[in-house]
Protein backbone atom coordinates (compact mmCIF):
# COMPACT_ATOMS: atom_id res chain seq x y z
CA UNK A 1 0.00 0.00 0.00
CA UNK A 2 2.85 2.32 0.81
CA UNK A 3 4.48 1.44 -2.49
CA UNK A 4 1.27 2.23 -4.40
CA UNK A 5 1.01 5.63 -2.76
CA UNK A 6 4.64 6.45 -3.58
CA UNK A 7 4.10 5.49 -7.22
CA UNK A 8 0.89 7.55 -7.40
CA UNK A 9 2.63 10.60 -5.92
CA UNK A 10 5.47 10.19 -8.39
CA UNK A 11 3.09 10.20 -11.34
CA UNK A 12 1.13 13.14 -9.98
CA UNK A 13 4.14 15.34 -9.28
CA UNK A 14 6.14 14.47 -12.40
CA UNK A 15 6.57 17.44 -14.69
CA UNK A 16 7.46 17.36 -18.37
CA UNK A 17 10.90 18.80 -17.67
CA UNK A 18 11.80 16.68 -14.68
CA UNK A 19 11.08 12.98 -14.83
CA UNK A 20 8.08 13.18 -17.12
CA UNK A 21 7.34 10.75 -19.90
CA UNK A 22 6.66 13.49 -22.47
CA UNK A 23 9.70 14.07 -24.65
CA UNK A 24 9.93 17.24 -26.71
CA UNK A 25 11.57 16.02 -29.91
CA UNK A 26 11.54 19.40 -31.63
CA UNK A 27 13.67 20.87 -28.88
CA UNK A 28 16.33 18.22 -29.47
CA UNK A 29 16.35 18.76 -33.23
CA UNK A 30 17.04 22.49 -33.01
CA UNK A 31 20.54 23.57 -33.89
CA UNK A 32 21.97 26.55 -32.13
CA UNK A 33 24.29 28.29 -34.53
CA UNK A 34 25.93 31.59 -33.78
CA UNK A 35 25.29 33.52 -36.97
CA UNK A 36 26.49 36.87 -35.69
CA UNK A 37 30.14 36.12 -34.96
CA UNK A 38 31.26 39.19 -36.88
CA UNK A 39 30.22 41.42 -34.01
CA UNK A 40 33.17 40.25 -31.93
CA UNK A 41 36.29 42.25 -32.56
CA UNK A 42 39.00 39.74 -31.70
CA UNK A 43 41.93 38.27 -33.59
CA UNK A 44 40.18 34.91 -33.79
CA UNK A 45 37.75 36.19 -36.37
CA UNK A 46 39.97 38.55 -38.35
CA UNK A 47 41.46 37.65 -41.70
CA UNK A 48 44.88 38.61 -40.37
CA UNK A 49 44.86 35.72 -37.92
CA UNK A 50 44.27 33.10 -40.65
CA UNK A 51 48.01 32.59 -41.11
CA UNK A 52 48.48 32.18 -37.36
CA UNK A 53 45.62 29.68 -37.14
CA UNK A 54 46.99 27.72 -40.13
CA UNK A 55 50.41 27.58 -38.48
CA UNK A 56 48.84 26.27 -35.26
CA UNK A 57 46.94 23.57 -37.19
CA UNK A 58 50.13 22.61 -39.07
CA UNK A 59 52.06 22.39 -35.80
CA UNK A 60 49.38 20.14 -34.27
CA UNK A 61 49.45 17.84 -37.31
CA UNK A 62 53.25 17.62 -37.18
CA UNK A 63 53.13 16.79 -33.47
CA UNK A 64 50.51 14.08 -34.06
CA UNK A 65 52.59 12.63 -36.89
CA UNK A 66 55.66 12.63 -34.65
CA UNK A 67 53.74 10.79 -31.93
CA UNK A 68 52.53 8.21 -34.47
CA UNK A 69 56.07 7.70 -35.75
CA UNK A 70 57.40 7.25 -32.24
CA UNK A 71 54.67 4.81 -31.29
CA UNK A 72 54.53 2.57 -34.33
CA UNK A 73 57.63 2.87 -36.50
CA UNK A 74 60.30 3.07 -33.83
CA UNK A 75 58.65 0.54 -31.49
CA UNK A 76 59.83 -2.66 -33.21
CA UNK A 77 62.86 -3.59 -31.14
CA UNK A 78 65.22 -6.56 -31.24
CA UNK A 79 63.30 -8.36 -28.49
CA UNK A 80 60.15 -8.63 -30.60
CA UNK A 81 61.97 -10.72 -33.20
CA UNK A 82 59.77 -9.29 -35.93
CA UNK A 83 62.20 -9.99 -38.77
CA UNK A 84 62.80 -13.55 -37.59
CA UNK A 85 59.08 -14.19 -37.42
CA UNK A 86 58.55 -12.79 -40.92
CA UNK A 87 61.31 -15.01 -42.30
CA UNK A 88 59.85 -18.11 -40.67
CA UNK A 89 56.31 -17.39 -41.77
CA UNK A 90 56.78 -16.11 -45.30
CA UNK A 91 59.96 -17.65 -46.71
CA UNK A 92 59.68 -20.79 -48.82
CA UNK A 93 63.17 -22.04 -48.00
CA UNK A 94 62.45 -22.38 -44.28
CA UNK A 95 59.44 -24.64 -44.65
CA UNK A 96 61.45 -27.77 -43.84
CA UNK A 97 63.61 -26.15 -41.19
CA UNK A 98 62.50 -25.26 -37.72
CA UNK A 99 63.38 -21.98 -36.13
CA UNK A 100 65.46 -22.02 -33.01
CA UNK A 101 64.66 -19.73 -30.15
CA UNK A 102 66.03 -19.31 -26.67
CA UNK A 103 62.56 -18.64 -25.31
CA UNK A 104 61.01 -21.65 -23.63
CA UNK A 105 57.35 -22.39 -24.23
CA UNK A 106 54.87 -22.81 -21.43
CA UNK A 107 54.52 -26.50 -20.68
CA UNK A 108 51.62 -27.43 -18.47
CA UNK A 109 52.83 -30.95 -17.68
CA UNK A 110 55.90 -29.64 -15.87
CA UNK A 111 53.81 -27.36 -13.71
CA UNK A 112 53.68 -28.29 -10.06
CA UNK A 113 50.30 -29.79 -9.29
CA UNK A 114 48.66 -28.54 -6.14
CA UNK A 115 46.41 -31.08 -4.47
CA UNK A 116 45.23 -28.98 -1.52
CA UNK A 117 42.38 -27.21 -3.39
CA UNK A 118 41.09 -30.56 -4.63
CA UNK A 119 41.04 -31.90 -1.07
CA UNK A 120 39.09 -28.85 0.12
CA UNK A 121 36.59 -29.20 -2.74
CA UNK A 122 36.06 -32.89 -2.03
CA UNK A 123 35.49 -32.20 1.69
CA UNK A 124 33.00 -29.46 0.78
CA UNK A 125 31.18 -31.76 -1.64
CA UNK A 126 31.08 -34.52 0.97
CA UNK A 127 29.64 -32.17 3.63
CA UNK A 128 27.06 -30.79 1.20
CA UNK A 129 25.96 -34.27 0.17
CA UNK A 130 25.74 -35.34 3.82
CA UNK A 131 23.63 -32.29 4.68
CA UNK A 132 21.24 -33.00 1.79
CA UNK A 133 20.86 -36.66 2.79
CA UNK A 134 20.36 -35.71 6.46
CA UNK A 135 17.71 -33.12 5.53
CA UNK A 136 15.80 -35.57 3.36
CA UNK A 137 15.97 -38.27 6.04
CA UNK A 138 14.82 -35.85 8.75
CA UNK A 139 11.97 -34.61 6.54
CA UNK A 140 10.75 -38.15 5.91
CA UNK A 141 10.96 -38.97 9.61
CA UNK A 142 8.79 -35.98 10.57
CA UNK A 143 6.25 -36.89 7.88
CA UNK A 144 6.07 -40.46 9.16
CA UNK A 145 5.64 -39.30 12.78
CA UNK A 146 2.89 -36.86 11.83
CA UNK A 147 1.14 -39.59 9.84
CA UNK A 148 1.31 -41.94 12.85
CA UNK A 149 -0.12 -39.30 15.17
CA UNK A 150 -2.98 -38.58 12.80
CA UNK A 151 -3.84 -42.31 12.61
CA UNK A 152 -4.14 -42.61 16.39
Swiss-Prot record:
Pfam family, one: EssA
InterPro entries registered for this protein in UniProt: EssA, EssA/YueC
TM annotation in the entry: 115-135
Subcellular locations according to the entry: Cell membrane
Keywords, alphabetical: Cell membrane, Membrane, Transmembrane, Transmembrane helix, Virulence
Name the record gives this protein: ESAT-6 secretion machinery protein EssA
Membrane-related topology note: Single-pass type I membrane protein
Function per UniProt: Component of the ESAT-6 secretion system (Ess). Required for the secretion of EsxA.
Topological domain spans for side Cytoplasmic: 1-114
Similarity field: Belongs to the EssA family.
UniProt cross-references to NCBIfam families, sorted A to Z: T7SS_EssA_Firm
Organism, scientific name: Staphylococcus aureus (strain MRSA252)
Membrane side Extracellular: residue ranges: 136-152
Subcellular location, principal: membrane
Gene Ontology cellular component list: plasma membrane
Note: This strain lacks esxB and esxC.
Amino acid sequence: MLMNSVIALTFLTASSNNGGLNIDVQQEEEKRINNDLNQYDTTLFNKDSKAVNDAIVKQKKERQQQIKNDMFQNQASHSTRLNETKKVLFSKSNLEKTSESDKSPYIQNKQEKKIFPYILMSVGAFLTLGFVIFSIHKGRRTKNESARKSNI
